[in-house]
Structure formats: structure tokens, C-alpha cells
Amino acid sequence: MRRPIKFLLASLVPALLLAGCATNPSDSGADAAKARGISLRFIGEATVPHRALVGGTTFGGISGIDYDEARDLYYLLSDDRSDHNPARFYTAKIAIDAKGIKTPEMLSVVTLKKPDGTTYGGKADKATDIPDPEAIRYRAETDTLFWTSEGDKKLGLDPVIREMKLDGTMIREFPKLPMFRMQPGDSGPRDNLTFEGMTLTPDGKAVWVSMEAARFEDGIDPTVDKPGGPARITLYHSNSGNPIRQIAYLPDAIPHRPMPPNGEADNGIPEILMLDQFRMLVLERSYSQGVGNSLRVYLIDTRDGSDVLNVPVLREGNYTPVQKRLVINFDSLNLMKLDNTEGMTFGPRLPNGNRTLVFVSDDNFRKSQITQFLAFEVIEPKPVASYIVEPPPYWWPYPYYGYRPWLFPRPIIVPRPHPRPKLD
């Protein structure tokens, strides 16, 4: 039986209209990924006894931490500049579940090696290549570790990024960017405020390294009333060590006024951590004399802001900083003590599939401070798929709905998850 034209139009027009309403998943996916935030649920706290002996060394000064998921193992980097014992890192097991965190079990100590295979000396040895270890990251693709040293302005030692084997044997050193070389006087990086944070992209192809604070050329030190200059965060190719991109991040002003008012106070970036291929967690730590430490975690998207890799001096108007969103202010935890936290890493997943987030503090080998581990559950909104409404194809299985070709055939709703961008 021939269908009238009006019936054909009645069935085709709605289908075409529905198809015209289809969503482009590549466009909406990127925006949705950037808009997604996270929240943290506090799990618990654990501490390590002051000056505990591990493998014949004094444990302390932990400035970096990373998690080896395959081995269920943590790497803890000490910032001891070979003053107490040769520069080193520790391996440890840390039991974490949804209800708490247990005291870490130290397993071994590994000394950092120079290119000739010897250990690093300290000031007492009158060494000229004293390291200042700060950040450590495990790269599963090569079963190796990256670590940073802040350098020393007085000794003329530049901040560096190095790769080593799990036994501490040095593999290589990344090429040095001229802008991060130590300079005399008030130019170049500020002393002890250089390569403090580091994180690898999930695919291991690139590594981000953050300055703790602004270079002299880029801005001032922070105050209680005014933020300091921008800290540069640089993306390097993991294999070549060459820089790819650089963004500018604006740390907060110092949140608490010191007591007395002219007392010591600062604020900077001790650590960064990739949440996924583009989103990054940034830890800000401040200290105010007479008040103590303050910690805040921010979420940024590394695609935001301008690329400042080739901008020699950052001034308002010649760059766009990345935007940041507050995830947590540790003041809200009401802990008995909040110490000098410098390390941040993901830990094991909980039974519900959520990741854990672990922080560790640097006690500076002082009796008045503690090595504090804080564990959190990471709660992320579940990704929402883009739905594309399409007209049915010619092979539409009408029998499933009853053979009624004179009725408008039902449209197909096809879920298409947001594509995950990858770094080439």
C-alpha cells in the first residue's frame, strides 16, 4: 500500500529535528572535564617517632613521597643534605582503608648516587655538589625514579631534575633551562624556592616541575596583604628532558598574620600532583611565626592560561595565569597539629573504587616537629556521557516494536562517553 506524502513527512521531520539536536562530544567533553571538581574526605592521621633509626640512618626530613601501585610500596625522599647521613630515600608500606591509616612500616633505605657511583657529601665533607632533594616520582614505564634538587645559590648549584634506578644509581640529568640557573644578587631563582614539586602525567610521557615561588624577575615575595609573584610550572618530555610548555600559577597571600607582626611568614608551592592527563592538584603551604602552618589544595587545568616558556619576565598584562579552584583548606580539619607538609601522592584504591590521597610532612629533624601522614578519600563526580540522538538506520529492527512501518520509528539514543585527550 502506498503511503501518503503527508505521513512520510510526519515521520521524517521529527527524526531530522532530533538528529539536529545532537551534541558534539568532543566540544562538550573538554568543557565538562574542566568543570568537574573533586572533594576530599579525611580518613586519618599517623606519625613516625622522632629520629627513628631505619637501616642505620636517622629518619626524617621527608619532603617527597610517591606510590608504586604494582608493588604497593611508597618511596619517601629525605631532604637531608648529607648532614645527618648521605642523601637518601626510604621504601615503606602504609596500610590505608576507608576507616584509617596505620603507622608506616619502613622497609629499606637507599642512598642517592652521583654519576661515578659514590654517595653525595655534605658541608662537613666540604663537598661542592651537595644535593637538596625535594620531590620524587616513580615512572612505571621504565621502573625508575625521578627526583629534584633545589640547588644552592651561595654554592652556585643550579636546581636539577634527575632520573635514577631503584637502587639509587644515577641514569641522567635533564637539560637545564637558563631561566632557572642560579644568578648572583637579586636575579634568577630565589634560594631554597626552586624545584619543590613534581608530577608525571598518567601516561608517563611528560613530567611537570613546579617552582616553590617566583623568580626575582617575575615578582615579589608574598605578604599577608598581597600575593607574591607567579610561580612557573614547566612541562618536560620524560624521555628527552626538553621543555614542552610552561604555565604561571599565582599562590595566595599569606593567610595568617605572624605574631609578632614582623615575625617570619611565607607561602609557596611544596608539591603538585596530576589528577588526570590535564587536571592538576596544587598544594600551597604557608607558615606564620607564632601561628603555625596552613595548607590548602587547589585544582587547576593545565590547558588554562598562556604558555610562558618563552616569556623571560612575567608582568601583569603579558601573560594569563591558570585559574584555580579550592578543594580543601586543612584549617577545617581541626587537627591537634598541622606540620610542615611537603609531599603528596595517590595511594591505593578503596573497595568502592575511589582513590586515596596521602600527604607527608617534613620535620626538619627538629624535636618540636613531627613526621605526619594524612590520608584522604578522593571523591570525584562520575563522568556524564554526551548523548547523541540519531534517526534509525535503514536496518532498524521494527519487529522488536511490532511491524508498524506507518508509524514514526523510534529514534536511537546513543551514549558516547567524553573522549579522553592524550598527550602526544
What are these regions (language model features)?
Residues M1-L9:
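Bacterial N-terminal signal peptides that target proteins for export
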Residues L12-L16:
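Alpha-helical transmembrane segments
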Residues L18-G20:
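C-terminal motif of bacterial Sec signal peptides marking the signal peptidase cleavage site
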Residues A22-P391:
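Sequence/structural signature of beta-propeller domains
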Residues A385-D424:
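Low-complexity, compositionally biased segments in intrinsically disordered regions
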